[in-house]
Amino acid sequence: MLNKLELLLTKAGIELSLQQKQQLVAYVDMLNKWNKAYNLTSVREPEQMLVRHIMDSIVVSPYLQGHRFIDVGTGPGLPGIPLAIVRPDSHFTLLDSLGKRVRFLRQVQHELDLVNIEPVQSRVEAYSSEPPFDGVISRAFASLKDMVSWCSHLPEPIHGRFYALKGVLPEEELTILPFGISIDSVIKLNVPELEGQRHLVILKSN
């Protein structure tokens, strides 16, 4: 599986250390193992996890601004854990309301010795942080409007950003953003061997 990952990274133009590659593969191994009992993802094949989970997450890394991030509705740690592996100098709070997912995240944290993640079991509207985050990240979590509404208390008011990983560009969602929120940028992502479109929508407060 390491060879497959290296091929995908080369296609994407991403350079990682051997340790980072090994951590990503170990994470996929754990996800595949736990998935049989906990049903953490609908993706069943480890090599497909490399494409649809690992690569789909880490291609976002160059566009993140800051060092403190929260991944809301992280599920089994996506995109937070892959991003934490490729950005060891950043810190990621991984938020999910389901206990079984958070238990998995804590096991990953322990086995991979990830010191820059903090798994938290909570609903997003009930969670608060001081200081606020540089970025709020979501992948398949909610509509842009709901994401911003539910998470408005989390980012730093001036420089904080909302990062929403989307498939096909949600043009209708972009027209009904809450008052005081505007589009910072929309980036078309290149994920090797992934069918369909991928976009990163970055939102900011006015």
From Swiss-Prot:
It is found in: Cytoplasm. It catalyses: guanosine(527) in 16S rRNA + S-adenosyl-L-methionine = N(7)-methylguanosine(527) in 16S rRNA + S-adenosyl-L-homocysteine. Keywords: Cytoplasm, Methyltransferase, rRNA processing, S-adenosyl-L-methionine, Transferase. It is an enzyme of class 2 (transferase). Its main location: cytoplasm. Transmembrane segments: none annotated. S-adenosyl-L-methionine binds at residues 73, 78, 124-125, 139. Its EC number is 2.1.1.170. One of its GO terms (molecular function) is rRNA (guanine-N7-)-methyltransferase activity. InterPro entries: rRNA_ssu_MeTfrase_G, SAM-dependent_MTases_sf. Coiled coil: none annotated. The keyword Manganese does not apply. SUPFAM superfamilies: S-adenosyl-L-methionine-dependent methyltransferases. GO terms for cellular component: cytosol. Signal peptide: none annotated. Belongs to the methyltransferase superfamily. RNA methyltransferase RsmG family. Specifically methylates the N7 position of guanine in position 527 of 16S rRNA. PANTHER family: S-ADENOSYL-L-METHIONINE-DEPENDENT METHYLTRANSFERASES SUPERFAMILY PROTEIN. This is Ribosomal RNA small subunit methyltransferase G.
